[in-house]
Amino acid sequence: MTEHHTPKSRILRFLENQYVYLCTLNDYVQLVLRGSPASSYSNICERLRSDVQTSFSIFLHSTVVGFDSKPDEGVQFSSPKCSQSELIANVVKQMFDESFERRRNLLMKGFSMNHEDFRAMHVNGVQNDLVSTFPNYLISILESKNWQLLLEIIGSDAMHYLLSKGSIFEALPNDNYLQISGIPLFKNNVFEETVSKKRKRTIETSITQNKSARKEVSWNSISISRFSIFYRSSYKKFKQDLYFNLHSICDRNTVHMWLQWIFPRQFGLINAFQVKQLHKVIPLVSQSTVVPKRLLKVYPLIEQTAKRLHRISLSKVYNHYCPYIDTHDDEKILSYSLKPNQVFAFLRSILVRVFPKLIWGNQRIFEIILKDLETFLKLSRYESFSLHYLMSNIKISEIEWLVLGKRSNAKMCLSDFEKRKQIFAEFIYWLYNSFIIPILQSFFYITESSDLRNRTVYFRKDIWKLLCRPFITSMKMEAFEKINENNVRMDTQKTTLPPAVIRLLPKKNTFRLITNLRKRFLIKMGSNKKMLVSTNQTLRPVASILKHLINEESSGIPFNLEVYMKLLTFKKDLLKHRMFGRKKYFVRIDIKSCYDRIKQDLMFRIVKKKLKDPEFVIRKYATIHATSDRATKNFVSEAFSYFDMVPFEKVVQLLSMKTSDTLFVDFVDYWTKSSSEIFKMLKEHLSGHIVKIGNSQYLQKVGIPQGSILSSFLCHFYMEDLIDEYLSFTKKKGSVLLRVVDDFLFITVNKKDAKKFLNLSLRGFEKHNFSTSLEKTVINFENSNGIINNTFFNESKKRMPFFGFSVNMRSLDTLLACPKIDEALFNSTSVELTKHMGKSFFYKILRSSLASFAQVFIDITHNSKFNSCCNIYRLGYSMCMRAQAYLKRMKDIFIPQRMFITDLLNVIGRKIWKKLAEILGYTSRRFLSSAEVKWLFCLGMRDGLKPSFKYHPCFEQLIYQFQSLTDLIKPLRPVLRQVLFLHRRIAD
């Protein structure tokens, strides 16, 4: 940017870091017209009408263009030689003739060369080999009046340079932009790096960096592949001699191979420190037999390690620390699991027996490594573990074998320190990825459970196999049909969907069947092999279309908001028809195993009715949102009926009103799918769903796979058909039926309808093969069948809990549910042990708490002012509960900054203030000020604080902030005094 135009928005700062030279079109015009006074911009603009001049000036100052190098002196004014459309056609054709990198330009989307099915374009009366296969609307933007006028000002040469070398970004409302030319920015790997502190590159530094060696991968982005230890069910004896190549350990070449394996970077081999996303093992290709000088001291230690590993019996150590337990049918499955401390003791014993003490440097470093290993084993299912975290507390100067030569006491220079750190980091990376993880994979079945949420559970593989056998046998008989090998080969050749792999999730005394449809398979096709795309990847177009059909039915209201909108509408209707004062009857039911009981033939008939339109268009675009410290990308796939498709230019205008600091990048070339194609893919997925169990393959006869990307959409259609078939009376005046997946809450002022709904659910829905769970059925009235839940059939209980909130049985006010800091909440949390743990912690707390906080909770047209205030209080209380659960998990690992509470209050204040503005209007007087919102939230956090966290550094500012806000808003309003008086009861 030039000095007189400093970018202020976050998205512009992000763009500035992606290009060597970023400027507005106005700056580019001034650059082109330098030294051309006769054709200056001011002289040309004087001939325009005032309104056109204003519009054109805004266009020049708001449109941004980025270059990989600063435009050279040769970019000067030249009179236009052709029209704008002809110039664009020539630029696109030139891109097809250039390198592959240039071919990814957005302007080329929708064009092809020498296509037989399309008529070629003509430029200046001469046939061009360029043909249009799909309308690229970005071209029409560049052919608009403003761009034609710009061509007259800067000329053909400068316009050609701008279109071919630059990336152009059109300004949208609220500091948003649309990319209309250049290589799509979502292809850049910049989204995990910070964007506000990156130094702006000059042309000279850019050239120097391009000539430098392969760039170092950040240790924060090098993660230990912990996900690979989960769900390894195959029971094979671990052949350590074969895995570690120990048969000829006395051979010098074997030890040399170990050195290459552990320290690949020192031998010039491909490694995780220089190649991102190194998913597979790279074969050792170094032919050099010379050991690098830096590894001469570790050579005898590695040789000693290999010999010890050859002598040790891993099975004996395993049976000692993780003994076999006899299984019994009456006990819970989790009672047979191993404690993480047992697994840790097993691995610690191996490390002590296999590795020499000198390889760790000293006992202090070894204890740090053991502590990190214990943390690694106790992490939950979705928690990550980076190399930066592992290396953060290790003192490199204390490791003797890293010293080059005999000068152990000499002062280290920076380059020597970095080299030592690099070598030991390679060893730590190998220790986890190639030593510890293979042992865990071989001896344990590792999973999460339904009861313990995300907590990692360890089983002996032989015990796991015995526990699973009865359940798998019954599932084979009830839901699956075995197919012979000949049919398998025929089906594999016909289908585009690979077979699915199942896994079992422990659930009290039984299991839940989970189907993995994200896995890719390598199959034999005659003499060749073919890698199949995963089932979920193939079915994404179908998922987009089913989502579109659901949005059409619900008028575009998201799933998570539909329940609240129905409740709001129901209350308004009761008030309108003067039925609000009548007693309200509540029935809550839960469908048993709904996914496993869906009838496939009925499902096909339902979906076929929904696919009314003959053809659908699927549009895909990317959004890049810039925050103060990073940029995140997201891919969106949307489906439309062919005749209802809205141009993307209008779509981004609407999206820009709801967001800020976002860049939109369209894929341009859309997909089209006919209804018959969609139905065929769906039928192939369900009726031809092949599941691999052991070495055999089975066909699923009943239900739909829970791991499918389509499951939630198909379940929605199936449930809606059930409602139309059995529960149409719930749509009468004075009644409402709320549904979240397989949970129903029926509210009515008619007791007969409530009893009818209850009796129907108790009998079951035979046509749809559904029955209800009696222990989860809740009512608030007496019933002749005697099915009464004593907990809720009580006059003192005035609220009905449902899906993260509770409904007042008289006023229908809604209160946000408050989680308790118990084992379930602790097990549901996950932390990322990376460099930016503080930011990750802050955003996790924010997202997890605000995700369930809908506008209805502070809508005073639905809730009373007191209950709206209570919901803000409960938000603070629940956020404090979650924060303490996270801090409990991060104990002795990380302490967030002391300004955590201040930052949280500021963000929450803005978020809730915005929600109030959306409900009551920005011009209306809101019933709470920003300071009062923060005070309520702070009061909730204070009351949610447990004694053990009262003096935690993270909450030091809490009491101070609460007192400051109390002094600021005095005297308190009556509603706030009421909250303060009853605050101890509000969270119950």
Swiss-Prot record:
The keyword rRNA-binding does not apply. It is an enzyme of class 2 (transferase). Its main location: nucleus. It comes from the Eukaryota. Its EC number is 2.7.7.49. It catalyses: DNA(n) + a 2'-deoxyribonucleoside 5'-triphosphate = DNA(n+1) + diphosphate. One of its GO terms (biological process) is telomere maintenance via telomerase. GO terms for cellular component: chromosome, telomeric repeat region; nucleus; telomerase catalytic core complex; telomerase holoenzyme complex; telomere cap complex. It is found in: Nucleus; Chromosome, Telomere. One of its GO terms (molecular function) is RNA binding. It holds the Pfam family Telomerase_RBD. Belongs to the reverse transcriptase family. Telomerase subfamily. Deletion causes telomere shortening and senescence. PANTHER family: TELOMERASE REVERSE TRANSCRIPTASE (PTHR12066:SF0). Telomerase is a ribonucleoprotein enzyme essential for the replication of chromosome termini in most eukaryotes. It elongates telomeres. It is a reverse transcriptase that adds simple sequence repeats to chromosome ends by copying a template sequence within the RNA component of the enzyme. This is Telomerase reverse transcriptase.
